[in-house]
Amino acid sequence: MIKITLPDGSIREFAQGVTPMEVAKNISEGFARNVISASFNGTTIETETPLTTDGNLILYTWNDAEGKKAFWHSTSHVMAQALEELYPGIKLTLGPAIANGFYYDVDFEDQKISEADFKKIEDRILEIARGKFDFKMRPVTKAEALEMYKDNVYKTELISNLEDGTITFCDHATFTDLCRGGHIPNTGIIKAVKIMSVAGAYWRGDEKNKQLTRVYGTSFPKQKDLTEYLELLEEAKRRDHRKLGKELELFAFSQKVGQGLPLWLPKGAALRDRLEQFLKRAQKKAGYEQVVSPHIGQKELYVTSGHYAKYGADSFQPIHTPAEGEEFLLKPMNCPHHCEIYNVRPWSYKDLPKRYAEFGTVYRYEQSGELHGLTRVRGFTQDDAHIFCTPEQLDEEFKKVIDLVLYVFGSLGFENFTAQISLRDQEDREKYIGTDENWEKAENAIINAAKDKGLNTVVEYGEAAFYGPKLDFMVKDALGRQWQLGTIQVDYNLPERFELTYKGADNELHRPVMIHRAPFGSMERFIAILLEHTAGNFPLWLMPEQAIILSLSEKYENYAKKVLDLLENHEIRALIDNRNETIGKKIRDAEMQKIPFMLIVGEEEEKNGTISIRRHGQEGKGNITVSIEEFASIVDEEIKKTLKVFTV
């Protein structure tokens, strides 16, 4: 008998060779009907894989991220079969699951594929799926695998890099593919499919290699799910931050300035400034000190930190100074500069923690094909801070940072999130720097802090930064999409590299621990996500313009100006639309600009010293007439509901 531990901690005994599906049926027949994938001791397996040892078993349904991953990966196999049948002679390469679907990179050689072909590919995929063919894994020798793919240079290259005894094929119907595993039970579960697009993609992501065709698709267990997903995509297009940023006059790009380098227009700059001031106020209460570092640094600085070895290829080329023979880099990270700020003077344990904060702009050489609006740029500003503390202070400092992140999210309407504990890949420790002892200390500090704060957590191995583990906040937006926003990282490595010290109570020198944190991540990316999450209807306290005064005619311009002065006295951000347009046209334009309050002034309002309020997005609900003081109270109350006071 073997002992199987389930996620709820319960342990059940089964005969050796029991399959995950049999375990699922032992739990509940109804539950088993929905199980489509499993993992055993952290390794993804099929539901019919025999279990021969004690271990931890997780069973996945379509509602689980791992279940969707297996579903989409399996569909990529079926799509590959359909493509081979429809386009004989093509060469298949790789076909992984990705967020919201899958892709397969294919060498079509002289054949062409276009949007006009999508329907026939979808039809063939569904035709194969209806056959209810089982996905079956089987081990093969390296020689057998190479023989199978002797005419496919791409698969041959992949196989050549694998060790004998680790190679497996996946079969379904008459189709075979090189694969590590992780499939649904059979093709019959696939009920709806959509080919989304095709694009060029270099083999292995290297532009020196041949350009292949990447075929993107998605699939679902019900047609209804696909229909809802496509409707969601249409809504996402309407909320696209690039579209809204242009319409709301927040930011722009210029080919003369350069790709991936956003220009912030007055309204966007005001929005950024308001976010910065919001965080600075909270940070001041939490004991942070503002610092400023230059946009460039000597190459040797980033060699010392390890960033040059890790990110050198993603940095802009060094800047050379002819006279001194020095090499400078555009700053890729702020942390080395903050280490040098710490090193300016000696510290005692009584001085710690030191908390340095900076809205520091950094630069990365992103490939032009990877640039995307504000979410992937070449120059971006991080709300960076670094805390230098004693090992004894680490747990408490980490918890305080969590409190700050939760305050930021709560004030901006991000209520649905998961805290991802990102740890080392236990099988590939060479890609990380630092000692095992320090890594274990750092990982335990994060796990304990997240537990103490009652966060909803998931653990992801292999997602740690190269210098330390981290806590990533995975936020769901209004469309249900998941984004990685705030991050907190523990680092024992940089204090070693920069020889940071403090004098302890024992009068000896010790190394501080370093915490990296950025609740926004970057201003650019955060604003892009916030823009799409709110569809441009930002919280009232954040809006560049909270109200617009619409005069019914030129006769009431002076009263409109008087109203504006009174609003400014109440610190309400407003402007006047005094164009020679109809009130209907002015209202439509204000609606397009998503200004929260339209204040209409005419004869009655001037006579009574009032304003008529129309709320954005509430057409047909009627206006209310109030005094300026009453309106100021309405604004103040609404802001208080969303913008809480940060307490430490």
UniProtKB/Swiss-Prot annotation:
Coiled-coil parts of chain: none
Predominant cellular place of this UniProt entry's protein: cytoplasm
Q: Where is the TGS domain?
A: 1-61
Q: What is its EC number?
A: 6.1.1.3
Q: Where is this region: Catalytic?
A: 240-539
Reaction catalysed by this enzyme: tRNA(Thr) + L-threonine + ATP = L-threonyl-tRNA(Thr) + AMP + diphosphate + H(+)
* Pfam families per the UniProt record, alphabetical: HGTP_anticodon (PF03129), TGS (PF02824), tRNA-synt_2b (PF00587), tRNA_SAD (PF07973)
The record's annotation in Gene3D superfamilies points to: 3.10.20.30, 3.30.54.20, Anticodon-binding domain, Bira Bifunctional Protein, Domain 2, Threonyl-trna Synthetase, Chain A, domain 2
- Disulfide-bonded cysteine pairs: these are none
One GO cellular-component annotation of the UniProt record comes to: cytoplasm
Location in the cell reads: Cytoplasm
Cofactor info, note text: Binds 1 zinc ion per subunit.
Bilayer-crossing residues are: none
Output the superkingdom of the source species.
Bacteria
**CDD domains, per database record:** TGS_ThrRS (cd01667), ThrRS_anticodon (cd00860), ThrRS_core (cd00771)
> Which GO BP terms, alphabetically?
threonyl-tRNA aminoacylation
Provide the residue positions that the database annotates as binding Zn(2+). Answer: C335, H386, H516
Q: GO molecular function: any one?
A: ATP binding
**Names of required cofactors:** Zn(2+)
Subunit details for this protein? Homodimer.
Question: Main role?
Answer: Catalyzes the attachment of threonine to tRNA(Thr) in a two-step reaction: L-threonine is first activated by ATP to form Thr-AMP and then transferred to the acceptor end of tRNA(Thr). Also edits incorrectly charged L-seryl-tRNA(Thr).
Q: Which family does it belong to?
A: Belongs to the class-II aminoacyl-tRNA synthetase family.
Q: What is this protein called?
A: Threonine--tRNA ligase
Give the source lineage, highest ranks first: Bacteria, Pseudomonadati, Bacteroidota, Flavobacteriia, Flavobacteriales
